[in-house]
Amino acid sequence: MTRLNILMAASECVPFAKEGGLADVVGVLPKYLAHMGHDVRVVMPLYSRIDPERFGLERLPGVLVVPMGIMGNQYCGVWEGRLPGSAVPVYFLEHEGYYGREGLYEEDNVGYMDNDNRFIFLSRAAMELPKLIGFAPDVFHAHDWHTAAVPVFLNTLYRDDPLVGGAASVLTVHNMQHQGNFYPGAMEVLGIGWEHFTFLGLEKDNQTNLLKGGLYHATVLNTVSEGYAREMQTPEYGWGLDGVVRARSADLVGILNGVDYEEWNPETDPHIVANYSRSDLSGKKLCKRDVQRFFGLPERDDVPLFGLVGRLVKQKGIDILAEAIHRILALDVQVVMLGAGEPWSHFYFGDVRNEYPEKFGLYIGYNNGLSHRIEAGSDFFVMPSAFEPCGLNQMYSLRYGTLPIVRATGGLDDSVENFDEQNLTGNGFKFWSHDADALFDTVGWTVHTWYRRKDAMAALIGNAMAKRFTWEDSAARYEELYCRALRKRLGVGVFVRRFGG
């Protein structure tokens, strides 16, 4: 088919700025789409943490004029760089007033008071950028609430724009919990008219809800797993917008994220003390001792080691782990944790470490190299999430022969196959109830399997390491989604004439 012009608008992108999995997708997916022959470009803020010299950014001539409704025109500089290892352009919006801050979204766990202006600006700038760079997008791809106003603008203020008005829009929801809820006055900054501040528009609970606007206006929608696409349509996981999602269910698909196997490969990983493969696991034992040594635990081969890497917040199930941890540590096991999050968890698990110094290791913060070492050295990886749109660590764990223990939700349920003791199939362990008892019972099941079923452990590890989640597959599905959006936007006849199928 003919090459598509795709403009991705996002609030974060690896390696420039990252707070969550959104950044990983935006930093990798464009490369694979470019490999398929498409012209993909990314636009994001130039946060103060992004060093133009370090990333080889160049400032483009001219100034981007960004209309901001009642606030009038605002102006920003535009810098251009590349996604590392590719020719994919990334455009950075330089606005000191909005993005010259320590955090991306918040400071001291408090969201910035002007986040509505900051990200309405990002969305509106994404609509104006094509004029500056001479690029005519066929598809605008927005991510989460931060750029959910892009499809809103495309369907309203830019509907008849000669450069971008014919483009389709895709909105990817990475997390329904975060919606961009602001005072009604945000409508004045959007500048699209109060007629859109309705139940069938951007209004929710008498506030301006940017995600809701995007869900209504995007040509098509997707999220990052088929399981989460179903869950978003329920009151439990829809966070008050499940009715909107159900109304758009015919236009919603789930596309599981891929894994960058160039970075996450135990055969070549430079972060781990010894490399290993599915056919030769000897190096994994050395990796286990390395992790035990780092955390000051006894270097034992004869005890199962459980790892956890991630944000220490309730969404990730840290509350039920806290409730179960003493019962877990009463077993003959070791547990190591790497992460940061809710302050209470730092103190709580710090006390657990002091109480069980030979069984429990803790590292508060984030350390990429250590996360690789924990994935390689652990026997099991714990992910007791309350909800998980996709999740990546369970996929890393499978590649490293570290069996995931997951709550069956969202992408965790999609990517992990539960152990079948009779047939020795599966590649991990699942539980369904989000409570400490279910977590503890499943850990007990894994401990029993570790000590009493060596045949099962060998089969599970082999199954796990054979599983693949490639970005090639994910990118092909996004290409299908873009074509679907264009057929809907333009009509099948126009689409075929322009793009050839």
From Swiss-Prot:
Pathway this chain belongs to: Glycan biosynthesis; glycogen biosynthesis
Q: Which Gene3D superfamilies match?
A: Glycogen Phosphorylase B
Q: Which EC class is the enzyme in?
A: transferase
What does the UniProt keyword field contain? Glycogen biosynthesis, Glycosyltransferase, Transferase
Q: Does the keyword Iron apply?
A: no
A Pfam family found in this protein is Glycos_transf_1
Q: Which GO terms describe its biological process?
A: glycogen biosynthetic process
- The Enzyme Commission number assigned here is 2.4.1.21
Q: Which reaction does it catalyse?
A: [(1->4)-alpha-D-glucosyl](n) + ADP-alpha-D-glucose = [(1->4)-alpha-D-glucosyl](n+1) + ADP + H(+)
Its domain of life reads: Bacteria
Is Glycosyltransferase among the key words of this record?
A: yes
Quote the CDD domains the UniProt record gives: GT5_Glycogen_synthase_DULL1-like
Gene Ontology MF terms? alpha-1,4-glucan glucosyltransferase (ADP-glucose donor) activity; alpha-1,4-glucan glucosyltransferase (UDP-glucose donor) activity
Residues binding ADP-alpha-D-glucose are K18
Q: Show the GO cellular component annotation of the record.
A: cytosol
The record's function comment reads:
Synthesizes alpha-1,4-glucan chains using ADP-glucose.
Which family does the record claim for this protein? Answer: Belongs to the glycosyltransferase 1 family. Bacterial/plant glycogen synthase subfamily.
Name of the featured protein:
Glycogen synthase 1
Annotated source species:
Geobacter sulfurreducens (strain ATCC 51573 / DSM 12127 / PCA)
Kindly list the organism's lineage.
Bacteria, Pseudomonadati, Thermodesulfobacteriota, Desulfuromonadia, Geobacterales
- Gene name, per UniProt, is glgA1
